[in-house]
Amino acid sequence: MTPANYGSVFSCCLFSSLMMLYLYVFCRSKRFILRNGTFVIYLAVGVVMIRMLLPWNFHFAANVESHKILPFLFNLLRVKILSVEFLTILVIIFCFGSCLRLALYFYKLVRYRHLLHQLDPLDDIRILRIFSDILEEYHCTKQILIYQVPGLSSPAISGLIHPVILLPDREYSDQDLRFIFMHELNHYLHHDLWKIFFWELVVCIYWWNPLSYMIRRLIKDTAEYANDIRLTKDRDELTRTN
């Protein structure tokens, strides 16, 4: 493995962008997921993520030398603006933007946990009993608190280490609660929160690449669709529709 340089970083960005474009164009359809499953998508995303976070040239890689395109691009980027190379300015902007995005992202996580701790966990006996039955059905021993959040538009699960389920502040039937808890618990058991978290880090670092945002949407949509398939595969048509 050779040290990172401008050439290896450019190759890393080019390879990753082509892979992300391929994933978004060919792998986001429901037909693809049904035929190949979600593992193929997550494996490809994992390869892209590792490559994006390791911008080095590896000894086992087959490197193709560029005698025209790369030299032309680097000569173009080495034009000086007020005695500073344009490439240096770009690197500073990209690094500053990445650090700022990472800082803001973790600040939002800390602020969110702080706001959550100001709420009291749900103590409704009926809701807790239904949730306890679902936990037992899924053989899940993790302690997961439930919060009712005013103004929340839809149920969600949050938290990587200490997950919590968030419910909008309204009335629910027993059947609604069962489906909500099964849906959110499946996200936790299949590590969907971790998948999204790691890709959020990639988005923070590659904030300037629009394809990273498109793959973030792909990961979320894939997780939701796979979850729906798991919950409805053994249900009758009326239940699936509901």
PLM segments and residue spans:
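Membrane-interfacial helical/loop segments at transmembrane boundaries in membrane proteins
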Residues: 65-80
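Membrane-embedded and juxtamembrane structural elements of multi-pass membrane proteins
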Residues: 2-63, 81, 85-242
